[in-house]
């Protein structure tokens, strides 16, 4: 067989990463036939822009709560443009735009990896791990990815440009980093936080020069200028209060345990990428190369709720280093004589090495070895299967057709001012498609839908979320008096019940849950009357 050069292999890997990764990002919504999980509020906000002729509205119509339209609006404008350009509904825009920008993030990641690792072979393998790491795609391809995926895309471009600015001092990069950074800020609040913190960290690790610091200040001024139309309008309408309340809802202290147990890759079977990442961490620490390990840890202490997404970026690079510099190098060494001694020498060489300008020091040949080729082919096939299976499971976290039909009935047959108590039995408000999509598809108010309330509740947001759990737990009760203890009947006009719980925490249940005893008690209650019923949904109206 003709020898394969590493450059040719790297080009092939990159091409596979981009195309297979894009397929994996579009596949869940293709399988579901609807947006994955969330995005109901965002669909309404896309329609709000249509009603306001693209001017930033003061409030969103979602759930009739006068929620300030304070969310970074770039994703909504992208959704509105896609809807108008292709003649699709806001719901369809929320379905497709996230997967599109999540796919664009793959080549953007390659650019960042190439700037950091200084070698296209390592960068290409890193990109493949990023493309096929479940956590690098899951929350970005959901309906809520309308803002998350552009935020991820522009964050990657910002950091890649900043690295070149710090290392090469190109003046044009000040403009481009400011532009991309401004678009990241305009996309998602957590993307703004992680971009800002990562930029400071990279400056500290790569430069620490006065010139780079001044350039960073110039980038920051451009970011403020680019994002000014949004935050100036919000301050004009509402003052700074929505921003203060939004900032008070972040954090998740327990997220650090995801780092401790190294489970945040969300791989459904063998955690291959996580294990290779751990090997890469050990190797980098032995070389006293702390940039990637520290960068992976920082998000969990800055913004724990969303830490896994940005942590996946350095982890993918660490996994590539672990695979090439440790696994491949050890296997190649074992083929020769005195394998154990050579491995020991290799480890010692790694420990004392301090060269950071590139990774060519550990490559013995420009030719790809048969071991590398065979192991890589196996890893590729396994990761494709694993990621496809994850996407298949993720496709179950969607709004099922019976719920869509029931919500259409609600829109057409109930008063516009009607208030609904929506019961699904889920234990995660962030993975409850019915609760979030109900106000969007019906135009009616849902009492315990939490989306958007972070801009109203502020520091009380987490307490408000916890207050929704007792209501959902009533579905497991055989006595509907549980409901009366959780919420007064005067607060709602109808009770919407999903009879079957298909998935929980965004993953399908092995055994679907039903709630026959609760439904029987509701039917027996003279205060309620079933006004709509199908095999999957029942709606009770108060007598």
Give a label for each model feature.
Residues 1-27, 365-378:
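Start-transfer (signal-anchor) and selected internal transmembrane alpha helices
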Residues 4-8, 206-217, 265-297, 336-353, ...:
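Membrane-interface helix-loop-helix junctions at transmembrane boundaries of multi-pass membrane enzymes
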Residues 99, 303-335, 339-346:
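Hydrophobic/aromatic-rich transmembrane helices and adjacent perimembrane loops
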Residues 11-156, 189-193, 396-399, 420-426, ...:
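Active-site lumenal/periplasmic loops and adjacent helix-entry segments of GT-C-fold
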Residues 38, 175, 184-282, 312, ...:
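Transmembrane catalytic cores of multi-pass membrane glycosyltransferases
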Residues 15-18, 216, 220, 224, ...:
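Transmembrane alpha-helix segments characteristic
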Residues 155-176, 280-286:
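Membrane-interface transmembrane helices that cradle and orient dolichyl/undecaprenyl
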Residues 18, 102, 107, 111, ...:
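Extracytoplasmic
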């Amino acid at each position: 067989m003709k020898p394969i050069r590493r450059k040719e292999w790297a080009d092939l890997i990159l091409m596979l990463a981009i195309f297979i990764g894009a397929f994996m990002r579009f596949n869940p919504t293709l399988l579901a036939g609807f947006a994955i999980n969330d995005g109901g509020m965002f669909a309404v906000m896309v329609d709000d822009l249509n009603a306001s002729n693209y001017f930033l509205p003061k409030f969103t119509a979602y759930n009739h709560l006068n929620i300030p339209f304070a969310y970074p609006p770039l994703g909504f404008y992208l959704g509105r443009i896609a809807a108008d350009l292709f003649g699709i509904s806001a719901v369809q825009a929320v379905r497709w735009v996230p997967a599109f920008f999540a796919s664009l993030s793959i080549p953007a990641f390659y650019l960042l990896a190439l700037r950091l690792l200084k070698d296209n072979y390592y960068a290409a393998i890193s990109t493949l791990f990023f493309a096929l790491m479940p956590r690098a795609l899951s929350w970005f391809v959901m309906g809520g990815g309308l803002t998350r995926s552009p935020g991820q895309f522009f964050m990657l471009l910002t950091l890649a440009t900043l690295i070149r600015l710090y290392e090469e001092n190109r003046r044009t990069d000040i403009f481009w980093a400011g532009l991309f950074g401004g678009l990241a800020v305009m996309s998602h609040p957590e993307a703004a936080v992680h971009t800002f913190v990562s930029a400071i960290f990279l400056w500290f690790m790569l430069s620490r020069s006065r010139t780079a610091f001044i350039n960073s200040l110039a980038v920051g001024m451009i970011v403020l200028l680019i994002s000014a139309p949004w935050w100036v309008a919000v301050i004009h309408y509402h003052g700074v209060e929505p921003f203060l309340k939004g900032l008070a809802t972040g954090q998740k202290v327990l997220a650090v345990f995801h780092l401790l147990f190294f489970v945040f890759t969300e791989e459904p079977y063998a955690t291959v990428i996580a294990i290779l990442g751990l090997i890469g961490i050990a190797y980098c620490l032995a070389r006293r190369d702390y940039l990637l390990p520290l960068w992976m840890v920082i998000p969990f202490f800055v913004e724990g709720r969303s830490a896994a997404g940005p942590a996946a970026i350095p982890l993918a690079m660490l996994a590539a280093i672990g695979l090439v510099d440790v696994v491949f190098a050890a296997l190649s060494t074992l083929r020769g004589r005195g394998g154990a001694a050579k491995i020991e020498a290799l480890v010692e060489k790694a420990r004392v090495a301090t060269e950071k300008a590139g990774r060519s020091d550990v490559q013995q040949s420009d030719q790809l070895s048969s071991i590398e080729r065979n192991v890589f082919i196996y890893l590729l096939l396994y990761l494709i299967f694993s990621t496809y299976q994850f996407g298949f499971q993720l496709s179950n976290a969607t709004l099922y057709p019976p719920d869509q039909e029931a919500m259409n009935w609600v829109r057409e047959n109930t008063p516009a001012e009607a208030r609904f108590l929506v019961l699904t039995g889920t234990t995660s408000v962030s993975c409850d498609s019915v609760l979030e999509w109900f106000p969007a598809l019906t135009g009616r108010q849902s009492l315990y839908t939490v989306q958007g309330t972070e801009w109203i509740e502020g520091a009380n947001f987490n307490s408000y979320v916890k207050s929704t759990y007792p209501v959902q737990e009533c579905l497991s009760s055989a006595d509907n008096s549980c409901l009366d203890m959780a919420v007064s009947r005067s607060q709602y006009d109808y009770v919407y019940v999903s009879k079957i719980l298909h998935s929980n925490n965004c993953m399908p249940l092995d055994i679907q849950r039903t709630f026959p005893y609760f439904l029987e008690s509701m039917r027996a209650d003279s205060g309620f009357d079933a006004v709509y019923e199908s095999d999957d949904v029942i709606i009770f109206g108060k007598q």
